[in-house]
Swiss-Prot record:
Family: Belongs to the universal ribosomal protein uS8 family.
Presence of the UniProt keyword Transport in the record: no
Naturally occurring in which organism (per UniProt): Synechococcus elongatus (strain ATCC 33912 / PCC 7942 / FACHB-805)
One BP term from GO: translation
Name of the protein in its database record: Small ribosomal subunit protein uS8
Self-association state and partner proteins as the record states: Part of the 30S ribosomal subunit. Contacts proteins S5 and S12.
NCBIfam families per record: PRK00136.1
Function: One of the primary rRNA binding proteins, it binds directly to 16S rRNA central domain where it helps coordinate assembly of the platform of the 30S subunit.
GO molecular-function term, one example from the UniProt record: structural constituent of ribosome
HAMAP family, per the entry: Ribosomal_uS8_B
Entry keyword set: Ribonucleoprotein, Ribosomal protein, RNA-binding, rRNA-binding
Record's signal peptide: none
Record-linked InterPro entries: Ribosomal_uS8, Ribosomal_uS8_CS, Ribosomal_uS8_sf
An annotated GO cellular component: ribonucleoprotein complex
């Protein structure tokens, strides 16, 4: 089945696997998905990711992180902001702060995919893809 919004699909797969306490989840591979996974890993929301498969069958295997003996998910929520039907852009002065800096906004800029903090530091704006906290 064709997916109209691969970013929302990726976020939903992560959210569902995290709520079900799965150790890993599989998402279709793309450069954008890989970039988002790199940001999530760098910010400590996922443990690791690896690419597997060949050609059209490529996918990313994301290792999720949990804390405590009750295995509470590190990712509390993921929210898609810019959607195919309504794109949301932000200039460098109006970049959003998620929960006062506790969470992150993932931004697609001319310099690549990065967090709101990195975009502010580099002085660039872009499309606000999602919030993670």
């Amino acid at each position: 089945m064709a997916v109209n919004d691969p970013i929302a699909d990726m976020l939903t797969r992560i959210r569902n696997a995290s709520e079900a306490r799965h150790a890993t989840t599989v998402v279709p591979a793309s450069r954008l998905a890989r970039s988002i996974a790199e940001v999530l890993k760098r910010e400590g929301f996922i443990a690791d990711f690896e690419e597997s498969g060949e050609g059209v069958q490529r996918h990313l295997v994301l290792s999720l992180k949990y804390k405590g003996k009750n295995q509470q998910p590190i990712i509390k929520a993921l929210k898609r902001v810019s959607k195919p039907g309504l794109r949301v852009y932000s200039n460098r002065r109006d970049l959003p702060r998620v929960l006062g800096g506790i969470g992150i906004a993932i931004i697609s800029t001319s310099q690549g995919i990065m967090t709101d903090r990195d975009a502010r530091r580099q002085g660039v704006g872009g499309e606000v893809l999602c919030y993670v906290w």
